[in-house]
């Protein structure tokens, strides 16, 4: 994007790019988040993100590479979006706004992609199991993971619809919400699974003893 100013149009589309340029000219670069009624926006965004996550997950059936490709494509879109605002000198404002909901949203999409990898790896690398049994185990494990992302998308959708639009909020408040969201992501996706597995391993050891 830095070397080709037409690249954002290729990735984000002409209409979105033109609308954003108009908002920047008006001094409201994040104006897109206030264009829709909060309730409708909450429902639409939440359902869309859940569908995206399930698409990334189910794509693992077509081998892990498809999940990786979809994650890569989404990464290009996010990178293009941020670089576009960097070119106009408002990257800081962009990050403070988008990461309010993006911290939860992007983390959940990545986790859904990992669930897709679990399906693909079960199909490609069955190990000592038959390919079908390995696939079923991977699908079951992956489904538990992706279902666990639904509450995260609901929270992210709420923040995007009701809070992100308020760019007049103090920057420290917005940064605080981002940091709390990040802490929750670490707790929900890293600490809780680790704690659960730790207790299961201890229980198994006691059973063997």
Feature names for model-found ranges:
Residues 21, 25-35, 39-44, 95-104:
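Short aromatic-rich membrane-water interface segments that cap or initiate transmembrane helices
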Residues 199-209:
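Short, highly charged, low-complexity non-transmembrane loops/tails of multi-pass membrane proteins
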Residues 184-192:
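Alpha-helical transmembrane segments
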Residues 34-66:
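Individual transmembrane alpha-helix segments
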Residues 1-26, 72-73:
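Interfacial/capping segments of alpha-helical transmembrane domains
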Residues 171-185:
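Small-residue-rich transmembrane alpha-helices that serve as helix-helix interface/gating elements
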Residues 82-168, 178-180:
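Hydrophobic alpha-helical transmembrane segments and adjacent short intramembrane/lumenal linkers
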Residues 60, 67-87:
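Small-polar-interrupted transmembrane alpha-helices in polytopic inner-membrane proteins
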